[in-house]
Amino acid sequence: MESTDVINEIRGILPRNSIGKYDLLTIFTHKTVFDKIVKVLSLDFQNKVDYVAAPEAIGWILGTAIAKELGVGFIGVRKGDKLPYAKEEIISTHFTDYSGQDKSFEISKSSIVRNKRVLIVDDWIETGSQMKAVIALLEKLDCSIIGLATIGIDINEV
């Protein structure tokens, strides 16, 4: 299965009336396309990772599916101030997102993911600031980032 075939299927599904960016949730409603996306994004990481990590919220949809495909655990990276722990129990990192807003990601210090091999997954990357923040957060737990997996489509061609 070629990734270009999957990209062409995605292009055929994405609504043409989006403003600014595409709503990738639309492609997740197509089971066969969603399954193909998960398989393509998982291919290079079989037996190479201990966990898949993804930022809240849409990244979790793709990340959990890829974790299941790879037979590994999932790390849900939370948006700031969402974890039910005292501040001293949380590791966080701050970043400026694609729209210029200050944001943060968090994970519990008691997380069992220290010193593990991790694949980071998200639905799309615009500026890379969100991915960089997830990398920084996991590196605070001494994790090895094995790779990044995301849906890559040139918006100009859709």
For every predicted segment, state its role.
Residues E56-I61, T127:
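Gly/Ser/Thr-rich loops at beta-strand to alpha-helix junctions
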Residues I61-L70, I135:
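Short Gly/Thr/Asp-enriched flexible loops that form oxyanion-binding sites at enzyme active sites
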Residues M1-V49:
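Active-site-facing substrate-recognition patch
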Residues A57, K79-D81, I153-D154:
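Short, ordered loop/turn segments at secondary-structure junctions
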Residues V49-E56:
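Short glycine-rich phosphate-binding loop at a beta-alpha junction
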Residues S99-V158:
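PRPP/pyrophosphate-binding module of the type I phosphoribosyltransferase fold
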Residues V72-V118:
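Short, glycine/charge-rich flexible loops or terminal/linker lids adjacent to PRPP-binding catalytic cores
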